[in-house]
């Protein structure tokens, strides 16, 4: 990859016969000369930065008009990449956009690799690595809340505390190295104060690390399994919740033989709902497989909706299934669903301590769905499941680097407590500083950059 090349790519989604506008983006030193070759400006408008020009895209040899278009000019350094950037806004659809792309390639541009526009923005110092990663997360956001967290990352709300922590570590290192280099000219280090400073940094590191799991939930979604014995209304609950007929519903126990999935958004949180086969002892070979998959789904879920028939109450079979689920995954959040309340109200039920919420539903009548969503949202907000309100969230790469910094800082404290020489302090302090720098992109290796930006789409 030659970063001195001028690159080009389609920057809009290409949907056959459906797109209204197609965008072809150029970035690099030759972006403006290439645009001048291809774009005819009938109004002789001034080619200044941050202006929109109206005209035609012409073939440079035949002068054939390829498309009527708008041209956006964003010259360095006031552009996304901090290079000269030009965008052709063409008519949508595959043919016009591909024709403009081919003309740009023929005029000397190179096809951009995935994420290369954002990579150039990073390498040119316009954004740091956390902001670059947040761009990809915003594009792939599955809910308004995950989009908001990604946008916070783009605005630097993650980079700021990381840079502050790195600065604090650099200050401590400077104090230590000054005592090494000028031992006779400076007073001894205030070791208790250094320990207090390290404790403060570690507390902030721990707070940021806590956002990792919740951020991952926003990115991938909350996995919710509807579990219970046969014919308690699990499939009816899925259909009512998803407002569709995803699952087959009959009065016959054992109708659902496999896990049925549906994708929903609950108060900004993406949710993958799993309707599982009714759990019971059976001789039916196919149903046995379904039961096994139900138990597996319950273990993988972030939250279980344990469903019983309210008209019948809590039965011995319900108790047996509940114990099997609790035994396989301790401390798993559960909501008890009392379904079929339109048929009969349950007698007093002793709620097991593992249950963290009770919701009454009449799934066949589409009743209780709003209450269920509120109960799930309350668990999330309380931090018992996944993602409470987040100002920002770190991803897995960032969490791994932050954990390295945390371990190095803990080692510094132990080194001080053991009374080891100051040279030993600096080793782990430098490790912590390096790990924190990797989060924002300082000193990050080329292989890490390749891995990060390969996940981007071409044109971003």
UniProtKB/Swiss-Prot annotation:
Broad enzyme group: hydrolase
An example Gene Ontology molecular-function term: GTPase activity
A GO CC term attached to the entry: cytosol
Record keywords, A-Z: Cytoplasm, GTP-binding, Hydrolase, Magnesium, Metal-binding, Nucleotide-binding, Potassium, tRNA processing
Record Pfam families: MMR_HSR1, MnmE_helical, TrmE_N
Taxonomic lineage of the native organism: Bacteria, Bacillati, Cyanobacteriota, Cyanophyceae, Oscillatoriophycideae
Binding site for K(+): 231, 250, 252, 255
Intracellular or extracellular location(s): Cytoplasm
Binding site for (6S)-5-formyl-5,6,7,8-tetrahydrofolate: 25, 87, 126, 460
Family: Belongs to the TRAFAC class TrmE-Era-EngA-EngB-Septin-like GTPase superfamily. TrmE GTPase family.
Protein name, UniProt field: tRNA modification GTPase MnmE
GO process terms (BP): tRNA methylation; tRNA wobble uridine modification
Gene of this entry: mnmE
Disulfide bonds: none
Subunit structure: Homodimer. Heterotetramer of two MnmE and two MnmG subunits.
Residues that hold GTP according to the record: 231-236, 250-256, 275-278
Cofactor binding note: Binds 1 potassium ion per subunit.
Function noted in UniProt: Exhibits a very high intrinsic GTPase hydrolysis rate. Involved in the addition of a carboxymethylaminomethyl (cmnm) group at the wobble position (U34) of certain tRNAs, forming tRNA-cmnm(5)s(2)U34.
